């Protein structure tokens, strides 16, 4: 946020969060990207970081491809930081994975998911300048069948295999 920019307030944030949620739930990448600065940095714990409006629009399209029925809910109102430069926005995503997850290229699993998370928005000129999502990436991976459930037989087998592999002598490259 620039030094000359007025501080954000609750009314602005509520309206902004409503437009953000509308864009996502309409699967409209351009609408979401329009709420970001041209040089936005957009980060996700599983998918990494992209930069720029075009990349954000592509991100929304990729999400809609992987989860065509996705919808986001806002279980609580957004929170504004004390200095009014950052917002924390709780959300819940409900979806079914019927398309490829790209990146990284996972095939559809057909599994339904429910993921709770929060968005962190830093503003510049009244738009999102830096975005970071936080959610339980391990829990999402388990729901999708991409990782074993904690305490499951599969997890125990993988742990045993890892212990065996750790005992094997490592070849030196030279």
PLM feature spans:
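C-terminal and inter-domain tail/linker signature
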Residues: 1-174
């Amino acid at each position: 946020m620039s030094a000359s920019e007025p501080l954000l307030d609750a009314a602005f944030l509520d309206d902004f969060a409503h437009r953000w949620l509308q864009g996502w739930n309409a699967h409209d990448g351009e609408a979401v990207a329009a709420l970001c600065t041209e040089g936005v940095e957009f980060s996700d714990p599983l998918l990494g970081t992209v930069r720029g409006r075009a990349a954000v629009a592509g991100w929304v399209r990729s999400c809609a491809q992987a989860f065509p029925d996705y919808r986001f809910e806002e279980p609580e109102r957004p929170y504004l930081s004390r200095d009014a430069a950052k917002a924390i926005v709780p959300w819940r995503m409900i979806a079914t994975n019927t398309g490829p997850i790209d990146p990284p290229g996972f095939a559809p699993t057909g599994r339904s998911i429910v993921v709770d998370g929060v968005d962190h928005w830093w503003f510049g000129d009244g738009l999102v300048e830096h975005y970071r999502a936080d959610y339980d990436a391990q829990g999402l991976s388990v729901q999708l069948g991409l990782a074993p459930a904690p305490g499951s037989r599969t997890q125990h087998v993988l742990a045993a295999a890892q212990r065996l592999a750790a005992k094997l002598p490592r070849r030196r490259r030279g």
